[in-house]
C-alpha cells in the first residue's frame, strides 16, 4: 500500500515507522529542514516541502497513493491537505490528525477527511484499515492487563448477515462492546441483527484475537 504522511514530528515518525515495519511503501513529507532525518527511517521516502503546495503533491504523483495521512501539528495544514488530497487527487482514503479538540468539527467529509483521530497508535491502525476490510485491526492496547481494543469489519458477503448477536459464540475473554453501522453507534443487544459492512469493536485479550478472526471471517 502506498501511503503519504505529512509531518515528520513525533506522531508522523511513529506512524511511518509502524507502517514501514508492516511492509507498506511510505513517503514522508516535512517542510522543516531541521526535522528531515532520512537516517531515522531509511526505508521511507523523505521529501522536503510544504504538503499544502500543489506542485509538491503533483511531483510525488499523489493520485497514485492509496492513503494520505495529515499528521502535522497544525490543524489548518491537516485540513487543507485533506481537502487537496480528496478533491484534486481523488485519494481513496484520507486520515487526519486532530491536535485541538475544539477543531474536531472541521474534520469531516466536507473537508476531505474520511477518518479523524488523535493518537498515533489508532492513526496507524486506521490507515491500514483502508485496505483491510475483512481483517482484525488492533486499535489500542490498554495500559493495564492484557486486553486490547480490536475492530473487525464484516465483508458485504458475510455469512453472519441477518443473524442476531446472540448467535455469536465469542471466545472467553472477548466482549463485543459496540457496533458501528454508517453514522449509527449501536449497543449490541442480543437480538440486534448483524449486517455486511458492520464495524464490530471488541475488548479482547491477545490470545482471543485469532479465534475472533476465525469466527467472524471464516473464509479469510
UniProtKB/Swiss-Prot annotation:
The keyword NAD applies. Gene3D superfamilies: NAD(P)-binding Rossmann-like Domain, Regulator of K+ conductance, C-terminal domain. One of its GO terms (cellular component) is plasma membrane. It comes from the Bacteria. Residues 137-218 form the RCK C-terminal domain. NAD(+) binds at residues 7-11, 30, 50, 72-73, 97. One of its GO terms (molecular function) is potassium ion transmembrane transporter activity. Pfam families: TrkA_C, TrkA_N. InterPro entries: K_uptake_TrkA, NAD(P)-bd_dom_sf, RCK_C, RCK_C_sf, RCK_N, Trk_Ktr_HKT_K-transport. Residues 1-117 form the RCK N-terminal domain. GO terms for biological process: potassium ion transport. The keyword Metal-binding does not apply. Keywords: Ion transport, NAD, Potassium, Potassium transport, Transport. PROSITE patterns: RCK_C, RCK_N. Part of a potassium transport system. The RCK N-terminal domain binds NAD and possibly other effectors. This is expected to cause a conformation change that regulates potassium transport. This is Trk system potassium uptake protein TrkA. It comes from Mycobacterium tuberculosis (strain ATCC 25618 / H37Rv). The gene is trkA.
Amino acid at each position: 500500500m502506498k501511503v503519504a504522511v505529512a509531518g515528520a514530528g513525533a506522531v508522523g515518525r511513529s506512524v511511518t515507522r509502524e507502517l514501514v515495519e508492516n511492509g507498506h511503501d511510505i513517503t514522508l513529507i516535512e517542510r522543516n529542514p531541521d526535522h528531515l532525518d532520512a537516517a531515522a527511517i531509511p526505508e521511507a521516502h523523505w521529501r522536503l516541502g510544504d504538503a499544502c503546495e500543489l506542485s509538491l503533491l503533483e511531483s510525488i504523483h499523489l493520485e497514485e497513493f492509496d492513503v494520505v495521512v495529515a499528521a502535522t501539528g497544525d490543524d489548518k495544514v491537516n485540513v487543507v491537505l485533506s481537502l487537496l488530497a480528496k478533491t484534486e487527487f481523488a485519494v481513496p482514503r484520507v486520515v487526519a490528525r486532530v491536535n485541538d479538540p475544539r477543531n474536531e468539527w472541521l474534520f469531516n467529509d466536507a473537508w476531505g477527511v474520511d477518518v479523524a483521530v488523535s493518537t498515533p497508535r489508532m492513526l496507524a491502525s486506521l490507515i491500514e484499515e483502508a485496505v483491510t476490510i475483512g481483517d482484525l485491526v488492533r486499535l489500542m492496547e490498554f495500559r493495564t492487563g492484557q486486553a486490547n481494543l480490536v475492530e473487525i469489519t464484516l465483508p458485504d458477503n458475510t455469512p453472519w448477515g441477518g443473524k442476531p448477536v446472540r448467535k455469536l459464540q465469542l471466545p472467553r475473554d472477548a466482549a463485543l462492546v459496540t457496533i458501528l453501522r454508517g453514522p449509527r453507534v449501536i449497543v449490541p443487544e442480543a437480538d440486534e441483527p448483524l449486517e455486511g459492512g458492520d464495524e464490530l469493536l471488541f475488548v479482547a485479550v491477545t490470545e482471543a484475537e485469532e479465534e475472533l478472526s476465525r469466527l467472524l471471517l471464516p473464509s479469510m
